Amino acid sequence: MKKQNLNSILLMYINYIINYFNNIHKNQLKKDWIMEYEYMYKFLMNNMTCFIKWDNNKILLLLDMYYNVLYNYHKQRTPMSNKRLMNSKNIMDYKLLYTYFYILNKMKMEMDNYNNNNNNISLKYNELLKNIMNNLNYKTSNIETNLSNNFYLMDKYLINKYMKYLDMLNMIPNNYMFNNINYKGKLNIKTVLDLNNNEFYDYLSGLIEGDGYIGPGGITITNHANDVLNTIFINKRIKNSILVEKWMDTLKDNPYFVNAFSINIKTNLAKEKIFTNIYNKLYSDYKINQINNHIPYYNYLKINNKLPIKNIMDIKNNYWLAGFTAADGSFLSSMYNPKDTLLFKNMRPSYVISQVETRKELIYLIQESFDLSISNVKKVGNRKLKDFKLFTRTTDELMKFIYYFDKFLPLHDNKQFNYIKFRFNTFIKSYNWNNRVFGLVLSEYINNIKIDNYDYYYYNKYINMHNARKPKGYIK
């Protein structure tokens, strides 16, 4: 038997997947042939000549992505029609995140061992590949069972997978050729817990400007449930504060659904610590007036009875915008798919941040600080309620924010990971042709990784470790 190299085996695996899709297509009703299968099947069929020129790492990433879809098919015998495959709001998303890298490492070991072995192996190549598939189906099921019994362990794996993705994507600017981007920067991977005091309070000031309220009783910061890690880290950093779960009243059909978390800062010790550190780090008149209106309630604070003044520091040189974006900003990674072909998919990454009219000066502050056109600020809404939105899409505009967020954005949560996808897709837009096909495939892969809301059961197991308090009137 002629010995094959790893690249040949990987290409055989792609052929095996094509045949697998063919069988699914023949044996399933048309309504079960969902969009993800259609796209992946056509992409494989149309681009085999491109794959032959790829290196092994690219092919392994491609196979990793495709295995995820096949694995979903095995786990969900009835595929979901008219829904994105990875948008299911349950714990399966977390199990799959861990499964990705297990599969990738398993494939590497199996194929490397086979490639380095002698010629006396009796297995044929297609039999080997089928055995790999069967082994993975069995072993990943056991992994999921173990992880589902320990949510904290599962979350730990999730964070580790983030770091691996970050490491992989961090190499993109240095290892790939771009047409019009000259960028040598790298992600500064840290969490809120890693910031020094000055950096943390810059970040906290921005977060309070967006999602905070300063009242006579203290400070309340409310974050969406998707940003639970961010909330927990901030609560841990502040100390002497209370973490409270919140439920949406409108979700009567699911009374256990956690919608948001609040950090309540009410003790005098915590309030003195926060106020003295954010006192002159605010940019909006709205939040400054909240402090001014409640100064009598804080007469015990050592702030010399001076009214706060508006911050005049350059927001490009501190963590304020990172905190403000965590509250009210979004990193989007949409894709434009022309009608004529799947091959020329275009990326449409964008950075969006909005504020109500009473705080529109913050939008103009960002626009001026990053030297953007006034046309980037749009007024949206109806006659009674208007929002001011900053919207950026051109590569030059997006690169200005990438230079900033690479340096100042803490990475540990859903919105921060959306930034990684946004950043990656911005670079994809400027790939030269040799790398563009691979970039588009990898972008599809990265964009399918999402964090959705946990259901109450898993939230409860996780949050109880952090002493979250349930709201008054909660009925178990």
From Swiss-Prot:
Annotated Gene Ontology cellular components are:
endodeoxyribonuclease complex; mitochondrion
* Record's subcellular location: Mitochondrion
**Biological process GO annotation list?**
mitochondrial DNA metabolic process; regulation of DNA recombination; RNA splicing
Q: How is it modified after translation?
A: The N-terminus is blocked.
What SUPFAM superfamilies does the annotation carry?
Homing endonucleases
Where does this chain mainly localize? mitochondrion
Q: Which GO terms describe its molecular function?
A: endonuclease activity
Which keywords, in A-to-Z order, does the entry hold?
A: Endonuclease, Hydrolase, Mitochondrion, Nuclease
Under which EC number(s) is this enzyme classified?
Answer: 3.1.21.-
Task: Report the Pfam families cross-referenced here.
Answer: LAGLIDADG_1 (PF00961)
Upon changing residue 36 to G, the result is:
In strain: D273-10B/A
Its quaternary organisation is:
Endonuclease SceI (Endo.SceI) is a heterodimer of ENS2 and SSC1.
Recorded family membership: Belongs to the LAGLIDADG endonuclease family.
**Function text:** Catalytic component of endonuclease SceI (Endo.SceI), which cleaves specifically at multiple sites on mitochondrial DNA and produces double-stranded breaks.
- What name does the UniProt record give this protein? Endonuclease SceI small subunit
Report the gene name. ENS2
